[in-house]
């Protein structure tokens, strides 16, 4: 009997990448594998994506792990380098870098490098998190063009703040701003991440940057914009096993704090997974779990190693039966909505105690 196991379906990953190529047929694809491949395993994911043209990471350590693992395709450091001491490592390992600040520009201008850095200039088009402001752009571009440490031509990118909100007018404003600012630029451009690829086709430029959708999880909350609706398949299925099936009488409480009281005589299943495995302790009563092909509600507080579900009075489930926490048959987005979080958080927060099995 297995405890918490995350099954990673690499065929689904390949399928999803091909669907994204169909969605944006004129764009090259930078597969975002930051945060340990969104919790799916950095190297395993990268090596399962022969159709990706490049990879995106957040930390230089992630890029070096890919290089040490034999990945030779371009790797982009999406947050850029953190200090001047990173620059020799970046150019030695052929890691492309975002530049989003004057401090980074000054570090490039003063560095003594053996090779040039490939730079993606990030423009703040309205999210106001990272990026040079539009009024700074001309000066920054001129200085980067004049810098011997920077490979030419420059590349350009920005990031959406509200692309998952189809009612927002911010995304169209960002698209128009970016297209206007980069008009006439010789370098390649990238604007669309997952939501942009799926809902804002005008943002599909020379490069797209799929993240969460690549793993078969939708960035949207609307049912008609589920991953399945986009013909995407879940890559991760998180499972565990029933380790006990108990008779609980009407009026009896279950678990820490007694936050669930049975309204009838029923059977409660105990599943070997908890917040020690990364399953959120904040999951409330009623959070769905899939047991033997049917949805059953969580009943009681998630503990470190276990959680409990109401199997129903006529349940035939037995010890050893599999429970699916999310994945095939139970989308992570649905679970996240019940918990009050986002699916990104679910898949990236599993702990080392969860066995990763690649299919």
Curated annotation (Swiss-Prot):
The modification N6-(pyridoxal phosphate)lysine is found at residue 34. Pfam families: Ala_racemase_C, Ala_racemase_N. GO terms for biological process: D-alanine biosynthetic process. Keywords: Isomerase, Pyridoxal phosphate. Substrate binds at residues 129, 304. Its cofactor is pyridoxal 5'-phosphate. The keyword Phosphoprotein does not apply. The active site is at 34 (proton acceptor), 256 (proton acceptor). Its EC number is 5.1.1.1. One of its GO terms (cellular component) is cytosol. Pathway: Amino-acid biosynthesis; D-alanine biosynthesis; D-alanine from L-alanine: step 1/1. GO terms for molecular function: alanine racemase activity; pyridoxal phosphate binding. The keyword Hydrolase does not apply. Catalyzes the interconversion of L-alanine and D-alanine. May also act on other amino acids. Belongs to the alanine racemase family. This is Alanine racemase. The lineage of its organism: Bacteria, Pseudomonadati, Pseudomonadota, Gammaproteobacteria, Vibrionales.
